[in-house]
Amino acid sequence: MQFDVVATNPPFQDSTNKKKTQHKLWIEFTQRAFDQWLKPEGMLLQVSPNSFLSPSNKILKLMQQKDVKYLRLDTERYFPKVGSTFADYLIYNRSSDKKTEIIVNDNTFEQTLDSTIFYLPNDISKESLEIHKKTIFNITNKLNVKYDYVTCHNTLIHRNDFISRTKTENHIHPIFHTNAQVWYSRVRQDWSNKKKVMWSRSGYTKPFYDDCVYGGTDMVYYVLVADDTSGYNLANNLNTKLMKYIFKTAKWSGFGNEKLFCSLPDLPTDRAMSDSQMYELFNLTKEEEVYVENYVG
């Protein structure tokens, strides 16, 4: 049986089989609404967590494929005693190239939700989306960001003695983990001996130049550079207010995201840029510059 309308606030997770279920029930429920329950042209009216803003989220991908009439992202105001964030939305079971009405804190604007917008910034507004378009979404030349998720994965610290939180006779090779933690490894990663700009996806994103000192855990991302000058310049440019804004507003659950990092623009390494030069490089309007300045502080 299929329906013209499904109106729901689906269960968040399986409270009975928590240990057996690795997915969130509300996501599966939403997918089934379109795969099984709704007629063609039928509509889903739903309240759910707003955790679908991040890259690769299944619900955001679904929205990109359907006709989203409206998307309200401040729904938690109606649930003041619930410590979570919510959204509500109306989605038709059909494809569409029409714009979606997005509502946040009494501000309303229209935006096409297509595959070029592979995440929604956590300060979503008309201004923020324009800034992310100019800096991330519409960029073709990207930084060559690298990572190593295998050699020194942080879970190894619980499984064997391959890595250690402290330096020992066997663990002599420093590996960058988070802004506050440097661990040590029994082996030297081949890229450790190369000049690079690196950062952790945990906590604040603070790129810095490393002159062949550190390796890294699976938390770490890096960009190889030709020399010291290039390294210091790139680190400077990645720490300008515009990039700090991008890192801050494209972060979910306290962590940066691989897809964002691998979509960073190929910034100059031949010079250290000022904030105003960075704004000019990406053609930000004066209003957008003020928005970034006010947000970053």
Question: Where in this protein do the model-derived segments appear?
Answer:
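Mid-sequence acidic-hydrophobic segments that form the walls
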Residues: 9, 13, 36, 257, ...
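Short SAM/SAH-binding signature in class I
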Residues: 2-9
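Glycine-rich nucleotide phosphate-binding loop and flanking beta-alpha elements
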Residues: 13-14, 52, 97, 205
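C-terminal substrate-recognition regions of SAM-dependent nucleic acid methyltransferases
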Residues: 76-291, 296
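A short beta-strand-to-loop transition that corresponds to the Sensor-1 phosphate-sensing loop
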Residues: 9, 48-51, 202-203
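Conserved Class I SAM-dependent methyltransferase catalytic core
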Residues: 4, 14-77, 88-91, 234
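Proline-rich low-complexity regions
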Residues: 10-11, 49, 265, 281
